[in-house]
Amino acid sequence: MADPACCWRSGEARRQSPGGLPNDAWRNTTHDWASAVDADHLAEVRRFPTVFAPGGTQHLILEVVAYAADEAETTTSGRCVVTLHADDSVSVSDNGRGTDTRCDDQGQPIKKPVMATKDLRFFDLSDAQLLPDGHPRRGMSVVAALSKWLIHTNRRRNGAWTQRYEQGLPVTDLVPIDDEGTSGTTVHFLSDASLCGPTAVTAAELGQRTVWPHLSVEVIDERTN
């Protein structure tokens, strides 16, 4: 696996995270650190797309923005840009802390498995938090599972990387990218129309739905001239 900057700067990384421990010893808060991919979970989501993403692409966008809202709540201020691209893909970029990335006891980079494992806070709960569309929040893995492809770009103080997924499964390692001195996450995805239906998202409706305390959301529609 290519080493992202967290392992290039091992001293800094270990000050910021419990380095030197096997990842199955790290405390789970939102996801299970011991599992990088839960293929059965992803397959379940793909079998029942209307259960886990009612409303299709719009619900997937809200699932992503909800994580930016989580970040904003911890700082009382955050910014997010949702871009509807001409190829019907969608990107969601925020200025939060970025996805937690650590080095294990072997010096290998490990990122919190937000894309390919269930969110322990929401997925199996009957009374999960409701998103602004009125449907339960299930987690980022639903977005990955129901997308033809998804690219997760992550920037933290200890380095930056990108990783590509197809049908929820990672198809690349963590690929280091230039550190711009900023932090935040970009999730760029193309929903699978065979599972979610055709993309039917308007910028106006999305602007009305992406309302969270402490988070400023800008919607850019590149599909129109």
Over which residues does each language-model region extend?
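Bergerat-fold GHKL ATPase/HATPase_c domain
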Residues: 1-77, 104, 200-201, 225
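A broad "non-catalytic interaction surface" signal
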Residues: 26-34, 111, 173-177
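Short glycine-/polar-rich loops that comprise or flank the Walker A/P-loop
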Residues: 146-150, 182-185, 212-215
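Flexible ATP-lid and adjacent glycine-rich G1/G2 motifs of the Bergerat
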Residues: 5, 44-51, 96-173
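Glycine/threonine-rich ATP-lid/beta-loop region of ATP-binding domains
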Residues: 186-225
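ATP-lid-like helix-loop hinge signature
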Residues: 63-97, 101
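Short hydrophobic alpha-helical segments used for membrane anchoring or interfacial signaling
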Residues: 83-85, 153-155, 219-222
